[in-house]
Regions:
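Short, structured interface segments
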Residues: 131-151
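Small/aliphatic-rich secondary-structure junction motif
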Residues: 1-55, 157-223, 243, 271, ...
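Charged helix-capping and loop-helix junction motifs
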Residues: 127-131, 203-207, 260-265
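Structural beta-alpha unit
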Residues: 74-112, 215-266, 274, 283-293, ...
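Helix-enriched interaction subdomains in cytosolic or periplasmic regions
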Residues: 110-137
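Short secondary-structure boundary segments
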Residues: 116, 191, 249-251, 280-281
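A short acidic, glycine-rich active-site loop
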Residues: 53-67
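Short beta-strand elements of ligand-binding domains
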Residues: 113-116, 142-148, 276-280
Length: 305
């Protein structure tokens, strides 16, 4: 049983991410937690009394949130009739990232799947501010970011971007390995270098351990020269090899951190055209995945906060 968190702002982009997640796990038993957060714009100091009008405003926004979630579940069930899937809706008066982190802990979430941009995000940015904050803040769960117009493709070609400067633990690689096994995928290990040169002893050791963890999974190593920026280089690589999903770890000085810090002019062309799986840094003893009890329950309810 997998627990998948689907944040939504009811935009087309978030709907596309939901469709991707449901298609990705159509053969697996899953509970999908669909989250909508709302924070009404109320201009008052935290020390001032809240007027009846402000309370009414919050009630209206909460009602709209709950109604939107109810309609969304109806839409999903009408389009995807899958007995393996159940849905729990969560309407919360909270900041999105704070609520996502809370739900990951309390619901033992395996994966967060979210759209790259919200309802008001412009197209020219690398990723929307919410998804970037989510990736930077979440320390114990992978995040799968889905582009606005990406149509689901079975991820049979997965790229894993790494510079081999860091030792990866088995727990950190587990989301990548499980994804590859589920879809009999080939893993393309891609190393972007500013100028091509031989690997250091440390890099060779880390590559050897990476290959050991991947075991019998088909995988290849590709070393490519940087083109203007890491993001542009990975985009070209993904297009040329018809990559269906790009995975990377997020830690200090990682490719993911470099991409979010690149000057905007270097990121204009990178529209996250394929799904991006971002795995958090866990260390030696941590794990994204908790042991869960199998249950025959079929939760379909709305949680209020």
């Amino acid at each position: 049983l997998k627990n998948i968190l689907l944040p939504t702002d009811f935009s087309d982009n978030s709907w596309n991410a939901i469709k991707y997640a449901i298609s990705l796990y159509k053969e697996e038993k899953c509970v999908f937690y669909i989250l909508n957060t709302y924070t009404p714009t109320i201009a008052h100091s935290r020390f001032m009394a809240i007027s009846d009008h402000e309370k009414m405003s919050k009630d209206i926004v909460r009602a709209n949130s709950e109604k939107g979630l109810m309609n969304l579940v109806w839409k999903i069930k009408s389009k995807y009739k899958n007995e393996h899937h159940s849905f729990v809706t969560i309407s919360s008066f909270n900041l999105l990232v704070d609520e996502v982190k809370n739900i990951i802990e309390t619901k033992e979430i395996d994966l967060v799947v979210a759209g790259t941009k919200g309802a008001s995000q412009i197209e020219e940015v690398f990723m929307g501010s919410n998804i970037v904050r989510m990736i930077k803040s979440i320390k114990n769960c992978p995040v799968l970011a889905i582009p606005s117009n990406f149509k689901f493709k079975r991820p049979s070609e997965i790229a894993f971007a790494t510079d081999f400067n860091r030792f990866y633990t088995e727990s950190e690689l587990r989301p990548l390995i499980e994804m590859a096994r589920s879809f009999q995928a080939t893993i393309r290990i891609v190393h972007v270098q500013y100028e091509i040169k031989a690997l250091t002893e440390v890099q060779q050791f880390n590559l050897g351990m990476l290959r050991k963890y991947l075991g019998t999974l088909p995988h290849y190593v590709h070393t490519v020269s940087e083109l203007n920026s890491v993001s542009k280089t990975l985009e070209v690589f993904a297009n040329e090899l018809d990559i269906h999903l790009l995975a990377m770890l997020h830690y200090p000085h990682s490719y993911m951190e470099k991409m979010t810090r690149e000057p905007i002019v270097n990121r204009l062309a990178f529209h996250t055209q394929i799904p991006l799986l971002v795995i958090p840094e866990l260390g030696m003893n941590a794990s994204c995945y908790s042991v869960k009890k199998e249950t025959s329950e079929n939760p379909s309810r709305t949680l209020k906060k």
